[in-house]
């Protein structure tokens, strides 16, 4: 809530939460994972530039919804080039073929997920909630 002198203005949760989670450095990305209960191998398995689609199909809309639930807003990043870092997660229950994907834009984490890498595997939030 922001006070404007008249009526309080309610800010969306993602706007308050995601003022910027540092992610430009590998140590920052690993710390982000650890703070949320995940252990990852260093260095990243991969680092690649990806573009957030301007038009979202049903799958990407679901991914954006998962990110929104964690406090991230991909809506404002449509068409933007981001860097995707992929880390092998070592403490996922009953599955060792699991990766964390962290999207970084202007040195800030803008999206993250934990994915089972086999065909049909699940994609879940990094941030518990």
Name the predicted role of every residue range.
Residues 35-95:
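Mature extracytoplasmic domains of secretory-pathway proteins
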